[in-house]
Amino acid sequence: MITNVMVDFLTYRGFDEIYVPNIQMAETFNGKVGPENNNMMYTFTDRGNRNLCLAPEYTAVIQTLADTAYKNEKDVKLFYELECFRGEKPQAGRYRQFTQFGVEILNPTKDYYGEMIADAAEMIARCGVDDYIVDTNVVRGLDYYEDKQGFEIRCERLGSSKQLCGGGKYEGGIGFAIGLDRLMLVSKLGE
């Protein structure tokens, strides 16, 4: 139900769903996801001796599409719902496998920053969370964000892992991701 609310909202706003594989080249994330996330990646070598990983997040993957598949297109509006994998200590609201719902605009022709923050907040509100806090002046731990600046939406009811959503501008685009597992913990939909 939560996913349907977000998909309906984004489809109405002109976004298209994209699917990308969970297994990625490990180098896709080098120098982009920060040293902490690099250390938590599940990596392995395949039969072709390529260094692969289970994707720890997807903005870095989508960012490469701005330079390749969508190189000649502007204002490409995409969303995705994909599984992420991180070798971190499981605790309340933090899992080794979790679902990321991401929203990206590739090769933007205008500054969508405020619009993306408003969309993220609106989606969270439509999912039955009314006690969220928007922080538009956050230093993000992911190296692909411009000046490491970004935004977060938090819910205090989640305790120490209170971030519901994070995003910002990066070379070739702007976007945010919502942790669906955390959103389900605080959503009033289905009560």
Label each region the model flagged.
Residues 1-191:
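TRNA-recognition modules of translation machinery and tRNA-sensing kinases, especially anticodon-binding
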